[in-house]
């Protein structure tokens, strides 16, 4: 759902209700949903972000590669859409549409009502209209246990959740919702690629030092201007951190696919220092039987 700058139960889903378009609002911290930073809240409420989203990401190299790896990693769907996949942080439905076309019963979850409206106006919008849930990824109690076969969380959406405890709570929810043996496909950006140039290396070091002094800051946290928002939040991972978080949340990590610095291909020579060379990772994890 986000790219940093360069250098109810699923069986009882209700149709997405239309709401009047409104400007983004600035909420005080005590009114923010759990795990949602102020800039992220504005992102989810801004009509302008949703309306231009598809065009904005169209030239991003990661677009296309992540969908291909997702469809290659998931087992083939059963006939008559009997294989249910949750797209967590579905945005305007980029992955939802691809999974629907591949024969999956695709359900989308997102906190942004404007983004969810965008799903209904795109390809397969009518089919997907009743398969959309507005929810905070950290608070997925609205979804019953063992009701999805697989799940995905692409485009560094998990990095938009503020706080490691909250990110792990999200992963724990997904492990509860996905049936035993099901897959989770998740993308994260790699914080350790920052060493490639001097400004990024300085930011990497500053983040490390700040994490030792400030309990509210975690190594890899970034706050930056993004499409008119002054303080967009994103947490970037290390290879070891995403592995540990998945395991601690009830997942078995089957593979961590390192991506090239621009995200446009799998990292060439992937076996050589992927933790430092990769621009990000796509993790393939399975819920134990």
Which functions belong to the PLM regions below?
Residues 270-289:
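Core SAM-dependent methyltransferase catalytic element
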Residues 2, 6, 13-80, 278:
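Conserved class I S-adenosyl-L-methionine
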Residues 93-139:
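Class I SAM-dependent methyltransferase SAM/SAH-binding core
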Residues 150-165:
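A short SAM/SAH-binding and catalytic strip from SAM-dependent methyltransferases
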Residues 142-151:
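A short acidic, Gly/Pro-enriched loop at the edge of an enzyme's catalytic core
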Residues 185-246, 258, 262-263:
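SAM-dependent methyltransferase
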Residues 89-91:
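Class I SAM-dependent methyltransferase "Motif I" SAM/SAH-binding loop
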Residues 168-180:
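A short glycine-rich, Lys/Arg-flanked "PGG" loop and its adjoining helix->strand segment in the class I
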């Amino acid at each position: 759902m986000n790219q940093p700058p360069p250098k109810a139960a699923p069986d009882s889903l209700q149709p997405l209700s239309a709401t009047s378009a409104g400007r983004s609002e600035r909420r005080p911290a005590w009114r923010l949903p759990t795990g949602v930073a102020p800039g992220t809240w504005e992102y989810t409420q801004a009509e302008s972000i949703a309306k231009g989203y598809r065009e904005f990401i169209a030239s991003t190299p990661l677009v296309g590669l992540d969908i291909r790896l997702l469809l290659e990693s998931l087992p083939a769907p059963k006939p008559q859409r009997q294989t249910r996949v949750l797209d967590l942080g579905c945005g305007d439905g980029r992955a939802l549409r691809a999974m629907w076309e591949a024969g999956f019963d695709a359900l989308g979850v997102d906190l942004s009502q404007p983004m969810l409206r965008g799903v209904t106006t795109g390809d397969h919008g009518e089919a997907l209209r009743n398969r959309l849930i507005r929810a905070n990824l950290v608070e997925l109690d609205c979804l019953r246990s063992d009701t999805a076969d697989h799940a995905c969380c692409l485009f560094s959406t998990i990095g938009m959740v503020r706080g490691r405890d909250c990110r792990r709570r999200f992963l724990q929810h997904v492990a509860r919702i996905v049936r035993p043996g099901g897959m989770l496909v998740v993308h994260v950006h790699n914080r350790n690629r920052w060493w490639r140039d001097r400004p990024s290396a300085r930011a990497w070091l500053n983040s490390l030092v700040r994490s030792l002094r400030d309990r509210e800051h975690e190594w890899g946290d970034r706050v930056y201007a993004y499409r008119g928002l002054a303080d967009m939040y994103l947490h970037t991972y290390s290879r070891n951190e995403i592995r540990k978080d998945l395991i601690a949340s009830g997942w078995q990590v089957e593979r961590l696919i390192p991506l090239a610095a621009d995200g446009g291909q799998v990292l060439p020579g992937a076996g050589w220092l992927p933790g430092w060379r990769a621009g990000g990772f796509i993790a393939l994890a399975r819920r134990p039987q």
